[in-house]
Amino acid sequence: MSDKTVTVEQIGSPIRRPFDQEATLVGLGLNKRHRRSTLKDTPAVRGMIAKVAHLVRVVE
C-alpha cells in the first residue's frame, strides 16, 4: 500500500459559513487562514476537500 499524502492550505474564512463547512475544516486540521495540513490521501479526505473546495487549496 502506498503512503500518498495531500497537503491543503486554508485560503478562506469559515465566518458566515454553515456549521458543517466549519466542522469539515476542523476535520482537515485547519482553523485559520494560510495554515497548512498534510493528510493521507484517502477517499474520505478527498470528499472533505471537495466539500470545502472554495475555502481550501491543494498544495502540490
From Swiss-Prot:
Instruction: Cite the GO molecular-function annotations of the record.
Output: structural constituent of ribosome
GO BP: translation
Q: Which UniProt keywords apply?
A: Ribonucleoprotein, Ribosomal protein
Give a Gene Ontology cellular component term annotated to this protein: cytosolic large ribosomal subunit
Question: Known Pfam families for this protein?
Answer: Ribosomal_L30
Q: Which SUPFAM superfamilies match?
A: Ribosomal protein L30p/L7e (SSF55129)
Assembly: Part of the 50S ribosomal subunit.
Q: Return the similarity comment.
A: Belongs to the universal ribosomal protein uL30 family.
What protein is this chain from? Large ribosomal subunit protein uL30
Organism listed in the record: Xanthobacter autotrophicus (strain ATCC BAA-1158 / Py2)
